[in-house]
């Protein structure tokens, strides 16, 4: 049996910090972020199914969220202003991410590649599933801004405004429900939510 380094690479997600150009009150790594995205994506799918006649598989979507940034164990977390500085850079970075996804997939024993491929390779999920995970990813970044601003860190004001614009572009009934029901608590202290 051939040795696989796949899970050793995934274990390094905890070493890759998000928001590398920002001064943060609380640091966040991609392992923590991916778990939160999985939680939120799962909730969005449930909300869509129960409130807005969706037909999604929430558990599958949670897994998509859990694995959505795994390629960053090979690429690192490129800051958003750099990643989207211009269309050429964004397009080239997508190619780098795709190569990293394929490399990660190739680390798995052959018999498991088809099982992991839908979670590791971007674009294999259907559009509705991708949309839910993108919404969850954006919501989690927005919630991070709320937490930082609530802790008095004004460094996140512009990021919050930018993310509000992105949320508006990705608007959906399930996202509105989530933001109205759950997001305000992120601006409260532990005593206030207890």
Curated annotation (Swiss-Prot):
GO molecular function, one term: nucleotide binding
Residues holding substrate: 18-19, 33, 69, 77-80, 137
Site feature location: Appears to be important in orienting the phosphate for catalysis: 18
Pfam family, one: YfbR-like
Lineage: Bacteria, Pseudomonadati, Pseudomonadota, Gammaproteobacteria, Vibrionales
Limits of the HD domain: 30-142
Tagged with keyword Cytoplasm: yes
Family: Belongs to the 5DNU family.
Function in brief: Catalyzes the strictly specific dephosphorylation of 2'-deoxyribonucleoside 5'-monophosphates.
Cellular compartment(s): Cytoplasm
Reactions mediated catalytically: a 2'-deoxyribonucleoside 5'-phosphate + H2O = a 2'-deoxyribonucleoside + phosphate
GO cellular component: cytoplasm
Sites where the protein binds a divalent metal cation: 33, 68-69, 137
PANTHER family associated with the record: 5'-DEOXYNUCLEOTIDASE HDDC2
Organism: Vibrio atlanticus (strain LGP32)
Obligatory cofactor(s): a divalent metal cation
EC number: 3.1.3.89
InterPro entries linked to this entry: HD/PDEase_dom, HD_domain, YfbR, YfbR/HDDC2
Top EC category: hydrolase
Protein name per the record: 5'-deoxynucleotidase VS_2195
Complexes and interactors: Homodimer.
Keyword Membrane: no
Keyword terms: Cytoplasm, Hydrolase, Metal-binding, Nucleotide-binding
């Amino acid at each position: 049996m051939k040795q696989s380094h796949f899970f050793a690479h995934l274990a390094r997600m905890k070493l890759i910090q998000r928001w590398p150009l920002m001064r943060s009150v609380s640091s966040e790594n991609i392992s923590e972020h991916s778990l939160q995205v999985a939680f939120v994506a799962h909730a969005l799918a449930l909300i869509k199914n129960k409130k807005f006649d969706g037909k999604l598989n929430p558990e599958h979507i949670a897994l998509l969220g859990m694995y959505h940034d795994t390629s960053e164990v090979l690429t690192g977390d490129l800051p958003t202003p750099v990643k989207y500085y211009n269309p050429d850079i964004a397009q080239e970075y997508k190619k780098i991410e795709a190569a990293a996804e394929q490399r990660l997939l190739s680390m798995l024993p052959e018999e498991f590649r088809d099982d992991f491929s839908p979670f590791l390779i971007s674009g294999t999920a259907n559009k509705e599933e991708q949309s839910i995970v993108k919404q969850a990813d954006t919501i989690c970044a927005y919630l991070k801004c709320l937490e930082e601003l609530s802790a008095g860190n004004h460094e996140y004001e512009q990021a919050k405004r930018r993310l509000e614009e992105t949320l508006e572009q990705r608007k959906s009934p399930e996202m509105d429900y989530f933001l109205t029901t759950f997001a305000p608590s992120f601006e409260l202290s532990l005593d206030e939510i207890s």
